[in-house]
Amino acid sequence: PAVGLGSWITFNVGDDPKLRAECRAVMAAFFGAGGGMIDSSPMYGSSQAVIGDALAKLGRPPGLFSADKVWTSAANGPAQIAETARRWGVGRFDLLQVHNLWDWERNLDTLEAMKAAGRLRYTGVTTSHGRRHGELETVMQRRPPDFVQLTYNIVDREVERRLLPLARERGIAVIANRPFQRGRLPDRLAGRPMPGWAREIDVSTWPQFLLKFILSHPAVTTAIPATSRVDHLRENKSAALGPMPDAAIRRRMAEHVRDL
């Protein structure tokens, strides 16, 4: 499992040169730490353009895994995808996802045709905030994409019941979004002492603790925390290092957070 980089809110900084430089520094640190997947969407304001500007200045690293979304009707999808590629400055995406299942059947037609023509590596569909799980399950059963993106963290665990087992069964890669509940979980845990047994899995901070829980689920491929700070980026990336919790420690982790 790996730690990717989300861009919701944190990279929506407009044309501000100082804030763009901060985002560029985060991306440089991300690639320097071996990072690959960067995820964005047309819904995320200026995030796509900020990513593209940073890639133009940093140079496109060979390990980049470019992930974006189509967030419109199928009729408008090709034009939106072309604009997204222009903003990123890429000729071909590694992954394009149907954002929040918008017109998913026809948008998947578009993405599957792009993949068949060699213009796209992988297809995906997304949901978030625990919504529309039944519909996502239908997609996974009827037209399994290469990737699904869904909300999963140490508190929001509904997907453990059906969607994560189904992803393993169907060979679908899983991207976990909202790993920190948009910062609420680290804020809630800040100042609380780390349990001594966390040393067994090389954890010393709460963000590491939260990410290791997610990454250790056997169905999860990557988690995509978003940040605009280099120190937080490095802390997040470190969660993929060292031993991962087994099933018994995962239960202990969830119980510990629940009881705090």
Regions found by a protein language model. Name each.
Residues 1-64:
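N-terminal binding-site loop/beta-alpha segment at the start of enzyme catalytic domains
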Residues 11-14, 18, 28, 32, ...:
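Glycine/proline-rich, positively charged
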Residues 31, 144-147, 162-260:
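Structured C-terminal cap/extension of enzyme domains
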Residues 44-45, 128-129, 154, 180-181:
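Conserved beta-strand edge residues that scaffold enzyme active sites
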